[in-house]
Amino acid sequence: MTAIDVLRSAFGGAHHWYQGTVADITADQANHLPPGIAHPIGSQMAHILHSEDMMVGMLSGAPTLWESQGWGQKLGLPMLSSQTTEGSRAFHCDPSQLNDYCQAVFAHTDGYLSGLSAEDLDRPFDLSSWGMGAMPVGQILTTMLLGNTYAHTGEISALKGTLGLKGYPF
């Protein structure tokens, strides 16, 4: 396997876990306010998808699908990647509509990954505007994007548990 094959497999796994975890979420469950300051399931779902869309767009130098394909308007949702606790807790969505955006984002990510070379993974990418300086593309993909998807999918699984639901799909 090449490094790109490994990345595509890792993202495929993360996407599989996410999709399996959210497959049975209803609108009521997605928009349920958990105790404390935790973000609702629907807000977590949208954050995972929009963050991946945004980061792949940034790394590829292309506009996000959110902008270029009008997903914000289609879904009637604001920008999603960095919401305050208050904004996340006020967020409402229809998870079945987010699934269409999910399919587009995951296909776009796989297309981006399949076009990379091993050398591209070492290319520094400037994240100074985020307070992180330059970081290799491969590190951004593994620590930021994969980490974000797995971490928030875990939160969704735990939040499902608080509703008496099975979390992960196994």
What positions do the PLM features span?
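N-terminal export signals and maturation junctions of secreted/periplasmic proteins
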Residues: 1-5
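Short, contiguous alpha-helical
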Residues: 8-19, 29-81, 124-170
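A structural signal for well-ordered alpha-helices, especially hydrophobic packing surfaces
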Residues: 22, 52, 106-109, 113, ...
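A generic alpha-helix structural signal
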Residues: 22, 45, 99-102
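Membrane-proximal, proline-rich intrinsically disordered regions
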Residues: 25-26
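Acidic/histidine-rich alpha-helical segments that form the ligand environment
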Residues: 78-123, 140-147
